[in-house]
Design a protein with these regions (language model features):
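Perimembrane helix-loop-helix junctions
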Residues: 83-85, 89-91, 102, 289-318
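Active-site lumenal/periplasmic loops and adjacent helix-entry segments of GT-C-fold
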Residues: 116-213, 232-234
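Membrane-interface alpha helices of multi-pass inner-membrane proteins
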Residues: 60-63, 268-284, 288-295, 333
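Membrane-interfacial entry segments at the cytosolic side of transmembrane helices
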Residues: 68-74, 96-108, 208-212, 264-267, ...
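Multi-pass, polyprenyl lipid-linked donor-dependent membrane glycosyltransferases
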Residues: 184-188, 208, 215, 227-254
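Membrane-embedded, hydrophobic transmembrane alpha-helices
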Residues: 1-98
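Specific aromatic-rich, kink-prone transmembrane helix
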Residues: 21-22, 26-29, 240-260, 268, ...
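Membrane-lumen/periplasm interface segments of specific transmembrane helices
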Residues: 123-126, 167, 311-337
Length: 337
C-alpha cells in the first residue's frame, strides 16, 4: 500500500515537471509567433499542447545524432522553466482564481478526483501486444542509441515511425522508478481534463456556452473512459493520438461556435496546423482527420489572413513532417515501408 502511494506521488511530481516543460516551451512559441494580446488560462493550456508538438520535433532532430538521454530532457526542461520564470507575473495573474467562486471549488474538487483516478489507473498491470509490451523494446532502443539505419529489418515493429516512443524514451530519463510511458499517458489525459473543466467555468453563459457545455461534456465522458481503458498504462501511441485529436476538436469547435475576431482565428489556425501535422507523425492513419481540421480552420479565415496562412503552412509543415519522414526512411531502410 505504501509503495502504491509513493508511486502515485512520484507520478504527480513527474507530471508537474512535464507540464512546466511543455507549457514553458509553448510560451516561447506563443510569444514569438502567435503574439496574443494577453496570457490567459486558455492560452496556457494551448501552450502545453504546442510545447508537446515542439518537443516531439526536437526529439526527432536530436535522435539523428544522439540517443534520447538525460541531456535531451534537460534541454526541454530548461526551455520550459526559463519561459515560466520570464513570464512569472503574467502566468500568476492568469492562474489566480479571482474572484474565487463556489463553482471554482467544484472544479478543483472534480479535478483532484480525476488526478487520483488516473494515477491509480496508470499503476495497473501492462497488458500484452499492441496495448502493452509491444512498444517497450522500441523505447529501449531509442534510449540506448541514435537512429539506427535499417533497424526495422531486425524486427518489423522497430520500423514503425511513431514519435510517441521518442516521448516515452525521454520520460524514462526522468529520475524515477515509474516507467516513462505511464507518466506520459497520464499527464496528457489530466491536462485535457483540466482544460475542459476550466474552460467551462471561464466561458460566458450564452447560447454558445450551452453548446460548448454539451460538446465538452461528451469529450469529458470519452476521456473518463479513456483514463480507465486499455491504453492508460500502455507503451503505445493511442493515448497521445486520442488526447491530441480531442484537443483539435475542441479548438475547431471554439472556432466555429464562439466566432472569435480575425486575429484570434489566425492564432487558432496556426495552432491547428502545427498540431495536425504532429498528429500525422503520431500515427499516419490520422492523416485524413488532420487534413479536415486544417481545411476547416483555413476556410474560416478571410482576406489577408488566408494568404498568410498558406505561407505559414509552407514553412511549418516541412518543419514537422520532413524530420519524421527522414527518421522513418532511416529506421526502415526503405523509401516506403
Amino acid at each position: 500500500m505504501i509503495e502504491l502511494f509513493l508511486a502515485m506521488v512520484e507520478a504527480m511530481i513527474a507530471w508537474i515537471l512535464i507540464a512546466v516543460s511543455f507549457t514553458g516551451t509553448g510560451l516561447w512559441f506563443n510569444k514569438l509567433v502567435l503574439k496574443p494580446s494577453e496570457i490567459t488560462r486558455s492560452v496556457l493550456f494551448d501552450c502545453f499542447w504546442i510545447g508537446l508538438s515542439l518537443s516531439l520535433i526536437f526529439l526527432q532532430l536530436w535522435h539523428f545524432l544522439f540517443s534520447i538521454n538525460i541531456f535531451a530532457v534537460s534541454i526541454i526542461l530548461l526551455s520550459g522553466v526559463s519561459a515560466m520564470i520570464a513570464n512569472f507575473k503574467e502566468i500568476s495573474a492568469a492562474i489566480t482564481l479571482k474572484p474565487f467562486q463556489k463553482k471554482h471549488l467544484y472544479v478543483l474538487a472534480s479535478f483532484m478526483f480525476f488526478v487520483l483516478l488516473v494515477t491509480n489507473r496508470i499503476m495497473g498491470a501492462v497488458l500484452d501486444l499492441d496495448t502493452g509490451y509491444f512498444g517497450l523494446p522500441i523505447i529501449e532502443w531509442y534510449r540506448q542509441y541514435p537512429v539506427i539505419p535499417g533497424l526495422g529489418n531486425l524486427q518489423t515493429c522497430f520500423a514503425f515511425n511513431q514519435v510517441p516512443y521518442l516521448f516515452f524514451a525521454m520520460l524514462e530519463n526522468i529520475p524515477s522508478f515509474l516507467p516513462g510511458f505511464r507518466a506520459g499517458n497520464g499527464i496528457l489525459t489530466i491536462v485535457l481534463i483540466a482544460q475542459i473543466l476550466f474552460n467551462l467555468v471561464d466561458s460566458k453563459e450564452n447560447r454558445a456556452y450551452k453548446l460548448k457545455s454539451i460538446f465538452q461534456g461528451i469529450l469529458l465522458t470519452f476521456l473518463i473512459v479513456e483514463s480507465l481503458g486499455l491504453f492508460a498504462n500502455a507503451a503505445c501511441p493511442e493515448n497521445m493520438l486520442h488526447c491530441l485529436s480531442i484537443f483539435l476538436a475542441f479548438k475547431i469547435f471554439e472556432l466555429l461556435v464562439e466566432s472569435p475576431d480575425e486575429k484570434e482565428k489566425y492564432r487558432i489556425f496556426l495552432i491547428v496546423s502545427l498540431l495536425s501535422a504532429s498528429l500525422v507523425t503520431i500515427k499516419i492513419s490520422a492523416a485524413i482527420y488532420a487534413i479536415v481540421c486544417v481545411i476547416t480552420a483555413w476556410y474560416n479565415l478571410a482576406g489577408e489572413s488566408r494568404k498568410k496562412s498558406v505561407y505559414s503552412l509552407l514553412v511549418r509543415l516541412p518543419l514537422v513532417l520532413v524530420p519524421w519522414i527522414v527518421h522513418g526512411v532511416i529506421l526502415s531502410g526503405y523509401l516506403l515501408f
